């Protein structure tokens, strides 16, 4: 059988068969020029310097008056180079008195000599109408010359301490019900009080209901209480109410009104030239009320009250207290804490104990802004813990 294909000649060289794809490519070409690439921008996270430990401790106390931070209570805003941080406290039992409407009125305010007055307490004596809880061994005033001079007379109110300047760092109150489960009925309501505290609503009087005119404190008097006790609270945007048995879940804290916390300068004495409105001398009822719209009254008020903070008013609706049997009222344990920053003159003995204040103004401004934003809500009268929510209006 004849072969179908002729035998390939050996003299002709065999070439490799190219694929159709390879045939279309040119045998030689110039190298492709790459387009210039843009420089790659690498994002670098900013490196934050760690905050000074002393400043962090001070901010912890500024945010929470009950903080267990080991540092001194100071505001790290750079307004004081050297100062002393002081923490003063009051622990007392509150009980609604047998005669009355079974309501305890607790008012917290940013004061130097004391920070809480209670209306309707069983410890009221005489006709004063309220109980004053002053800080023990902390900034009292000798008003004996004014007491002896009488109403409208001249006299000196002298300081018993050597504090030159002061300002409030933080202040708060905790309340705990001491009654048993069978006697824990009752409720409370509270609001923030941001109105300007007028000077004529304050007075010098003896603290802790003691009869003394040489060591008085400065705080709200009965005139201020008479206008507040009957005020309708429910329409306030900061209104909060709750069961009395859950009051220990709340921390009532004064909030800053601005980021400016200026020091209050305290003179050694005030000369009250016709600046005394009322002088009542009757046992524990001793008090000196200042006249309204006088230079002395405004000077004293501006020096002893830090108006950069607001106030808190708590109205507690207690059990009936008949004084006998099972109706013995509502007993509450009050724990008040006031953190203050103090400055002394060079000639005072306390001056050598002053320490350098920390500086963290940016962190302080941020903490202050967050605190002021949080107080807008009605439930921010204090920190609500353990899942207990307040009875508040819907937003």
Swiss-Prot record:
Keyword Isomerase recorded: no
Subcellular location(s) per record: Host nucleus; Virion
Chain ranges for the short sequence motif Nuclear localization signal as given in the UniProt record: 2-9
Ranges in a coiled coil: none
Protein role: Self-assembles to form the virion icosahedral capsid.
Disulfide bonds: none
Species of provenance: Chaetoceros diatodnavirus 1 (Chaetoceros setoense DNA virus)
Protein name in UniProt: Capsid protein
Any single GO CC term annotated in Swiss-Prot or TrEMBL for this entry: host cell nucleus
Keywords: Host nucleus, Virion
Keyword Transmembrane helix: no
Region (Disordered): 1-51
Residue stretches of biased makeup (Basic residues): 1-41
